[in-house]
Amino acid sequence: MNISATARSLLLSEFVSAFFLAMRYFFQPKPTLNYPFEKGPISPRFRGEHALRRYPNGEERCIACKLCEAVCPAQAITIEAGPRRNDGTRRTVRYDIDMVKCIYCGLCQEACPVDAIVEGPNFEFATETREELYYDKAKLLANGDRWEREISKAIALDAPYR
């Protein structure tokens, strides 16, 4: 055993350096959040709870093209289109999403030509029963109305990358 190794073991240099390292981090601000009361920042591309959007005049955006239903890999979306209106457009009669099947891939949002179906910023939608995770058109439109300000802001921030 050489002299330097003996000196290091007697003087406990590793212990002292580790102690000073721990003290340096001990006095820094804590990086944790008090979660239910404080929330961290969310990316504009965050994929949370689904929502159906409306136009500013209150009309729903969905034109019943069924692209989101076709592209969904989990087959979680079910759409029934109503008859054509006088102006030639269609609207949905039934728009259901089975959130139990959904894998939050965002393909429905990418496929939609009118930005009708989006995945909003809400990530707190735990339920007590499984049936509450079957979203119908009314629930999706209510989500869209509730989160419209945040959704439109996120879409505007993401626009340069589309």
From Swiss-Prot:
Its EC number is 7.1.1.-. Keywords: 4Fe-4S, Cell inner membrane, Cell membrane, Iron, Iron-sulfur, Membrane, Metal-binding, NAD, Quinone, Repeat, Translocase, Ubiquinone. Residues 52-82, 93-122 form the 4Fe-4S ferredoxin-type domain. Its cofactor is [4Fe-4S] cluster. It is an enzyme of class 7 (translocase). GO terms for molecular function: 4 iron, 4 sulfur cluster binding; iron ion binding; NADH:ubiquinone reductase (non-electrogenic) activity; quinone binding. PROSITE patterns: 4FE4S_FER_1 (PS00198), 4FE4S_FER_2 (PS51379). [4Fe-4S] cluster 2 binds at C72, C102, C105, C108. One of its GO terms (biological process) is aerobic respiration. Its main location: membrane. It catalyses: a quinone + NADH + 5 H(+)(in) = a quinol + NAD(+) + 4 H(+)(out). It is a peripheral membrane protein. Pfam families: Fer4_7. Binds 2 [4Fe-4S] clusters per subunit. [4Fe-4S] cluster 1 binds at C62, C65, C68, C112. Belongs to the complex I 23 kDa subunit family. NDH-1 is composed of 14 different subunits. Subunits NuoA, H, J, K, L, M, N constitute the membrane sector of the complex. PANTHER family: NADH DEHYDROGENASE [UBIQUINONE] IRON-SULFUR PROTEIN 8, MITOCHONDRIAL, NADH DEHYDROGENASE UBIQUINONE IRON-SULFUR PROTEIN 8, MITOCHONDRIAL. NDH-1 shuttles electrons from NADH, via FMN and iron-sulfur (Fe-S) centers, to quinones in the respiratory chain. The immediate electron acceptor for the enzyme in this species is believed to be ubiquinone. Couples the redox reaction to proton translocation (for every two electrons transferred, four hydrogen ions are translocated across the cytoplasmic membrane), and thus conserves the redox energy in a proton gradient. This is NADH-quinone oxidoreductase subunit I.
